Amino acid sequence: MHDTFKHTTVLLDEAVNGLNIKSDGIYIDGTFGRGGHSRLILSQLGEHGRLYAIDRDPQAIAAAAEITDPRFTIIHGPFSALAEYAEERGLKGKIDGILLDLGVSSPQLDDAERGFSFMRDGPLDMRMDPTRGQSAAEWLLKAEESDIAFVLKTFGEERFAKRIARAIVERNREQPMTRTKELADVIYAATPVKDKFKHPATRSFQAIRIWVNSELEEIEQALKGALSALTAGGRLSIISFHSLEDRIVKRFMREQSRGPQIPHGLPMTEAQLSSLGGRQLKALGKMMPGESEVADNPRARSSVLRIAERTAS
């Protein structure tokens, strides 16, 4: 069933332009969402070009059914496995570009039934793929107080993590939470100092969502896989929405652009040096949305686009 939730693709032209599309190229859109990037890529491909799109959200897979273009293939699964999908199709080292639009999408946030938002009451779920893994409610009910505090601090940078974790555990002992509003209310009550511009539950909801979906591990795995999937000259175009995501992408591109770091003065033969390989990426810079895009779509404000190119080594 087609959903009616509006989704405005952030940095649409910039991210696709970063792929440097060739008409007969082979591309991966690792985060199909509602197909904004995929449709633009397809519009720039010739008859022999190919686009493989990936998403683990069943609603995104349903939306992809609207695209009947023979050059397009949709894959239901996590983008962390993009290298496996490429290898299964005999495309290892042959991909001309990979695009990733990280984080949660507007349709996921806006649909109360998905449980991502503290602004809309719904089931306390938060899974990108509701058919797999445990929901936020299930995890919070079973987790130790110290584990909850760790997640809130690490993935939400929440300064009241311990206090909020204690309140969550105490509430679940009385009556297990099953709704997003219940969790938001517990967090609100446990937060001693309120931010004038941000709901107290913002950081905690982000942290729990990242943990439930293993989002940062997914990114790290996808980045490593991209190196084996891309051909020389192939592009990597990645949009991040918060500092935790961008830090991983930035560090990866920097490290792969630098090549192996060898301690000064360490004796090595030419063969040993050669076996270490050279740099595998060339970082091509970053972009942020302009004022007009942020005005049209406030969720674009924190987005960062980073582009890199696979080297021949």
UniProtKB/Swiss-Prot annotation:
<dbReference type="InterPro" id="IPR023397">
    <property type="entry name" value="SAM-dep_MeTrfase_MraW_recog"/>
</dbReference>
<dbReference type="GO" id="GO:0070475">
    <property type="term" value="P:rRNA base methylation"/>
</dbReference>
<keyword id="KW-0949">S-adenosyl-L-methionine</keyword>
<feature type="binding site">
    <location>
        <position position="108"/>
    </location>
    <ligand>
        <name>S-adenosyl-L-methionine</name>
    </ligand>
</feature>
<dbReference type="InterPro" id="IPR002903">
    <property type="entry name" value="RsmH"/>
</dbReference>
<dbReference type="GO" id="GO:0071424">
    <property type="term" value="F:rRNA (cytosine-N4-)-methyltransferase activity"/>
</dbReference>
<protein>
    <recommendedName>
        <fullName>Ribosomal RNA small subunit methyltransferase H</fullName>
        <ecNumber>2.1.1.199</ecNumber>
    </recommendedName>
</protein>
<dbReference type="InterPro" id="IPR029063">
    <property type="entry name" value="SAM-dependent_MTases_sf"/>
</dbReference>
<feature type="binding site">
    <location>
        <position position="79"/>
    </location>
    <ligand>
        <name>S-adenosyl-L-methionine</name>
    </ligand>
</feature>
<dbReference type="Pfam" id="PF01795">
    <property type="entry name" value="Methyltransf_5"/>
</dbReference>
<feature type="binding site">
    <location>
        <position position="101"/>
    </location>
    <ligand>
        <name>S-adenosyl-L-methionine</name>
    </ligand>
</feature>
<keyword id="KW-0698">rRNA processing</keyword>
<comment type="similarity">
    <text>Belongs to the methyltransferase superfamily. RsmH family.</text>
</comment>
<comment type="function">
    <text>Specifically methylates the N4 position of cytidine in position 1402 (C1402) of 16S rRNA.</text>
</comment>
<feature type="binding site">
    <location>
        <begin position="35"/>
        <end position="37"/>
    </location>
    <ligand>
        <name>S-adenosyl-L-methionine</name>
    </ligand>
</feature>
<keyword id="KW-0489">Methyltransferase</keyword>
<feature type="binding site">
    <location>
        <position position="55"/>
    </location>
    <ligand>
        <name>S-adenosyl-L-methionine</name>
    </ligand>
</feature>
<keyword id="KW-0808">Transferase</keyword>
<dbReference type="GO" id="GO:0005737">
    <property type="term" value="C:cytoplasm"/>
</dbReference>
<keyword id="KW-0963">Cytoplasm</keyword>
